[in-house]
Regions:
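Conserved ATP-dependent adenylate/AMP-binding module captured primarily in the ANL superfamily
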Residues: 1-29, 69-88, 118-130
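Conserved pre-ATP/AMP-binding loop-to-beta segment of ANL
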Residues: 32-50, 83-84
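Conserved AMP-binding A3 loop
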Residues: 46-70, 80-82
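Conserved S/T- and glycine-rich ATP-binding loop of Class I adenylate-forming
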Residues: 51-54, 87, 102, 132, ...
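AMP-binding/adenylate-forming
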Residues: 63-70, 86-141
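Gly/Ser/Thr-rich phosphate-binding loop
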Residues: 142-194
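AMP-binding/adenylate-forming core of the ANL superfamily
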Residues: 205-233, 262
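AMP-binding/adenylate-forming catalytic core of the ANL superfamily
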Residues: 226-274
């Protein structure tokens, strides 16, 4: 079992637990959390993860718990998360995004509120959260409730241009994430509410390109670099602008047109879904 896997300041729904009592409570109230905690606290140094298919066909892979802890610490440092901060997990625990929200809370000593995923997770809450993770779909249906969040990360797909305009200069710090299961969740964040266009690497991460596609180097997490299908404009080894997927490029008379870039431009002129 990795050191740092459980912070004694961790709370679930505002209540402190010993590790043993946490397992008993999770078993009674949230089976998926219980199953994850059983695996997280066993003697194995790894945990089984299911990939979403970003870098190929969906598959299962064994991930080192120490690497998940390091990823949580790097996110905490980047976003200045503090012990006792209230965090909301409204993502499924089947995949890396939901699992890492739990890991961040366990490692950093956050007060975690865990609810069933829905399109508007904040609707039933009156209290304010310091840290929340959404999908773009959840974000689009929760705009009116963003005042309940201090820092929000959004992953699983790009935020559309219409929503970005709404978010610009919002009091909530909203970040779009870039990453995948193989990199233990995100390795770069884009500060959307400040109008930023580029993703900025977390500590220990750097980037290169090959044929305009992003290559990821991640100290202590990746044993070898990952070559992606993401077309980017590389600003530096720490920053890039995401353009789209190379497998979505349209070849029109030998002119390469990026599907996502075209969609972003059209969304500024077309107000109805297309």
């Amino acid at each position: 079992m990795s050191s740092g896997f459980y912070n004694n300041d961790f709370k679930l729904n505002g209540v402190s637990y010993s590790l043993e009592s946490l397992l008993l409570t999770a078993n009674a109230v949230h089976y998926n959390l219980f199953e994850f905690l059983k695996e997280w606290t066993d003697k194995s140094s790894t945990i089984m993860l299911q990939t979403s298919g970003t870098t190929g066909l969906p598959k299962k892979l064994q991930m080192s718990k120490s690497k998940m802890i390091l990823s949580a610490q790097r996110t905490g440092a980047f976003l200045n998360l503090q012990t006792g901060d209230k965090a909301l997990c409204c993502l499924p625990l089947d995949y890396i995004a939901g699992k890492m929200m739990v890991v961040r809370a366990l490692v950093l000593g956050l007060d975690l509120y865990l609810i069933k995923p829905s399109k508007n997770p904040l609707k039933t809450f009156s209290n304010r959260f310091d840290f929340v993770a959404f999908t773009p779909y959840q974000l689009e249906h929760s705009i009116q409730h963003l005042g309940k969040i201090k820092t929000l990360i959004v992953g699983g797909g790009p935020i559309n241009e219409k929503t970005k305009k709404i978010l610009y200069k919002n009091e909530t710090d909203v970040y779009e994430t870039y990453g995948m299961t193989e990199t233990v969740s995100h390795v770069a964040l884009k500060h959307v509410s400040q109008g930023k266009q580029e993703f900025k690497a977390l500590k220990g991460v750097r980037f290169e390109t090959k044929n305009n596609c992003l290559k990821i180097f991640c100290d202590s997490i990746l044993t070898s670099p990952i070559m992606t299908n993401d077309v980017v404009n590389l600003i530096s080894e720490k920053r890039f602008v995401w353009k789209g997927r190379v497998d979505f490029v349209i070849n029109s008379g030998a002119i390469k047109i990026n599907h996502e870039e075209l969609e972003n431009k059209l969304s500024k002129a077309i107000s109805v879904p297309y």
